[in-house]
């Protein structure tokens, strides 16, 4: 069977990540003609690699939904092939040989078209995915193979003519076009063409409308699916929770890594370059919960690996010196301690209190302008580059919140999540060593009492000043106001020094920081507090959350009780069903394709209502079906 493959590259800058190049090379082995189509020019950084991997490159200057149509119009040989596979860069793989899939589907010569998995979205279950990071806000046909008979038909030509008719070149009009593409198989099935899918889940697996999003591990282990949607690693958590416990992406990545047949580093490479940190941290469950009393490594990982590790502390409140000393006493003797403070008198008190510690201890005087942030970025910048890993701590006192126990509990949580014991410190270093991409570990945001408003309001009024700092530092990590920062709210955290290199090398001066009194929001200090994960990601590392086992015990039950109280309030006020619907289907009313489909209702044979309800009738027993 002579086969063409049209590959739609969706990156807005025309950049082909490693996972894209890997897939192109594998597809080339199965194709007589491999055409890549891109909206706009290819990125110079990967252009040569792309041109080497494919037979033809087609540049589309219209909306992305026109990519396939552009390739069809410019490469006439495609329609003469026995089969043409339309594939986009939402997929990565292959994790199993593509030859298996193509050999099996060649045996079904009665099909006019086929897909990888059954088409799943409907009016009951709206399309769940976010668009890929850094591409325009629309969805795309990701994988469908058309046979020669269908491609030579008038209906096939009519479909693409309607898609590209004058007036549909803009991105706004292309939203509707994207929805047409998403249910192209439903359309051709509706008008009498015979379709099928390589994988036909059964035995209860078929009840899930979004196989790629909600059951990738099952598709991988049970059905030997060769390709997977990379958006499973970035789809916002609330959409995953609509139908699962939240486990799909993380469990799948671990299973993929354990098999060892696919380089998962290609996935991480793309996530670090193009994905919002909160999306992949949530989807993959990047929370390291470490024991406080059981040492994971057999020996001190600092001494065993010849590492340099330090505790940086900024101490301002001498009435909290006892608490700060207790925190420092949890540091292994193999770690150095550097303390900054604002006066000679305080320095003498700290030196006296810390004298009994077995560690190397150095106390430095710093200006109070910029508080704890300048203390580290100015006062300790010269030595930060000499260390491999650093734990950063500063004493906290929140006088503006009453009762005082609220602020003290926040400080307690920060301590409990970063340095509750000597063993915990060693376990944290061990986690860094086992995860070479890990760059920044922070406690989760405070969420008790006064702080319960923080989740959902993580930026507060600080997005614009953080965005400004993001630009000043020349950061490349994606940042957006509708994506919250994986930040340390309270500035107590662990980090790999190489991951924050750019921040320390900026050359900060005390004059860069605001004088006292500092506003409660919208200051440089608040921007720095939120910028750490973006610096980390821009340096090629990932941020994640860190908790002790005791902190996790408290957090889980606290959040459960918070949700329980919300439900009790809803029950008391007669809105429990409304709340339940909201919590289980957050985005149902926001299904972005609904209005787009309404715009094209009545366009010839392309009925929007029919598109939304059409189901592909396979007509054969597909892979996995008994």
Short names for language-model regions:
Residues 1-623:
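ER/Golgi luminal nucleotide-sugar-dependent glycosyltransferases, focusing on the catalytic module
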């Amino acid at each position: 069977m002579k086969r063409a493959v049209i590959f739609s590259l969706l990156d807005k800058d025309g950049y082909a990540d490693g996972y894209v190049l890997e897939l192109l090379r594998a597809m080339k082995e199965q194709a007589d003609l491999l055409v890549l189509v891109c909206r706009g020019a290819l990125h110079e950084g990967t252009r040569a690699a792309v041109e080497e991997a494919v037979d033809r490159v087609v540049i589309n200057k219209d909306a992305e939904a026109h990519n396939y149509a552009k390739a069809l119009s410019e490469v006439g040989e495609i329609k003469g092939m026995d089969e043409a596979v339309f594939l986009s860069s939402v997929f990565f793989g292959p994790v199993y040989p593509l030859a298996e899939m193509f050999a099996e589907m060649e045996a079904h010569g009665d099909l006019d078209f086929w897909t990888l998995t059954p088409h799943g979205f409907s009016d009951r279950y709206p399309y769940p995915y976010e668009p890929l990071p850094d591409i325009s806000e629309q969805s795309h046909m990701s994988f469908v193979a058309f046979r020669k008979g269908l491609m030579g038909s008038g209906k096939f030509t009519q479909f693409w003519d309607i898609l590209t008719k004058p007036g549909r070149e803009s991105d706004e009009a292309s939203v509707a076009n994207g929805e047409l593409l998403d249910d192209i198989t439903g359309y051709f099935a509706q008008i009498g063409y015979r379709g099928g899918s390589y994988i036909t889940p059964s035995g209860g697996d078929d009840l899930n409308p979004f196989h790629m999003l909600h059951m990738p591990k099952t598709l991988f282990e049970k059905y030997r699916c060769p390709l997977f949607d990379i958006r499973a690693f970035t789809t916002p958590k609330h959409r995953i929770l609509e139908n699962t416990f939240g486990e799909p992406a993380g469990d799948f990545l671990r299973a993929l890594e354990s098999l060892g047949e696919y380089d998962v580093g290609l996935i991480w490479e793309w996530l670090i370059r193009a994905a919002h940190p909160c999306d992949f941290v949530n989807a993959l469950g990047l929370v390291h919960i470490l024991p406080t009393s059981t040492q994971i490594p057999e020996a001190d990982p600092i001494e065993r690996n010849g590492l340099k590790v330090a505790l940086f502390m900024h101490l301002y409140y001498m009435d909290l010196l006892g608490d700060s000393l207790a925190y420092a006493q949890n540091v292994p003797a193999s770690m150095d301690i550097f303390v900054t403070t604002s006066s000679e008198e305080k320095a003498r008190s700290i030196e006296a209190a810390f004298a009994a510690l077995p560690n190397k201890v150095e106390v430095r005087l710093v200006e109070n302008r910029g508080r704890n942030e300048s203390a580290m970025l100015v006062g300790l910048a010269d030595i930060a580059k000499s260390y491999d890993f650093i734990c950063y701590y500063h004493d906290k006192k929140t006088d503006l919140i009453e009762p005082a126990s609220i602020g003290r509990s926040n400080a307690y949580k920060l301590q409990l999540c970063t340095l509750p014991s000597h063993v915990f410190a060693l376990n944290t270093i061990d986690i860094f060593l086992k995860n070479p991409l890990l760059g920044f570990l922070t406690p989760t945001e405070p969420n008790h009492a006064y702080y319960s408003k923080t989740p959902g309001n993580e930026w507060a009024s600080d997005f614009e000043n953080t965005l400004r700092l993001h630009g000043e530092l020349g950061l490349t990590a994606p940042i957006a106001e509708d994506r919250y920062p994986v930040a340390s709210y309270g500035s107590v955290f662990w980090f790999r020094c190489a991951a924050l290199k750019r921040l320390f090398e900026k050359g900060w001066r005390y004059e860069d920081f605001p004088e006292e009194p500092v506003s409660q929001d919208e200051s440089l200090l608040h921007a720095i507090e939120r910028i750490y994960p973006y610096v980390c990601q821009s340096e090629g590392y990932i941020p994640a959350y860190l908790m002790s086992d005791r902190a996790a015990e408290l957090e889980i039950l606290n959040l459960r009780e918070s949700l329980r109280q919300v439900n009790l309030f809803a029950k008391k006020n007669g809105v429990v069903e409304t709340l339940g619907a909201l919590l289980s289907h957050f985005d149902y009313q926001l299904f972005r394709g609904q209005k787009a489909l309404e715009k094209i209702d009545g366009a010839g044979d392309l009925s929007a209502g029919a598109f939304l309800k059409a189901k592909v009738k396979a007509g054969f027993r597909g892979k996995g079906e008994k």
